[in-house]
């Protein structure tokens, strides 16, 4: 995507490198999104950056990522901070971000919105064991609530 640099936020590798990491048991979680532009693959690698024996880590991911992280690290090691936004507001924000792109891809925005409705369904939230939700209506209030709860851990 425009503006992304290798090693800043993401690391980009080819299929062969990904398969080698899988064979070596280094892939913590992976998923593929069938986008308008073709499949996009994302994964998290155990490269030593996440050291739960001595540090805490914050990762941003989907329910699928959360479930895979629990399987890899153990359920007692992973605490969900489920942030939700009302559908209309989420769509408004996504549309505003897309309009800022040099070449907005509204078809992909719509695909992602519909996919998210399935990926974050009430059924999947329940299956993941998510008990607490943070509503991101007022950003500052949402952040204060999250910070308060994180301090408990």
What are the language-model segments listed below?
Residues 100-150:
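Small-molecule kinase domains that catalyze NTP-dependent phosphoryl transfer to phosphate-bearing small molecules
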């Amino acid at each position: 995507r425009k503006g992304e640099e290798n090693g800043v936020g993401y690391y980009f590798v080819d299929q062969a490198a990904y398969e080698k990491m899988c064979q070596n048991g280094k892939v913590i979680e992976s998923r593929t999104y069938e986008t308008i532009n073709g499949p996009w693959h994302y994964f998290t690698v155990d490269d030593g950056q996440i050291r739960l024996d001595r540090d805490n880590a914050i990762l941003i991911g989907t329910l699928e990522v959360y479930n895979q992280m629990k399987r890899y690290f153990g359920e007692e090691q992973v605490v969900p901070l489920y942030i939700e936004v009302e559908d209309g507001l989420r769509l408004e924000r996504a549309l505003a971000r897309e309009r800022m792109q040099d070449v907005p891809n509204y078809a992909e925005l719509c695909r992602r919105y519909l996919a998210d409705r399935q990926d974050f369904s009430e059924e999947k939230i329940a299956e993941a064991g998510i008990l607490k939700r943070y509503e991101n209506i007022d950003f500052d209030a949402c952040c204060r609530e999250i910070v308060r709860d994180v301090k408990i851990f």
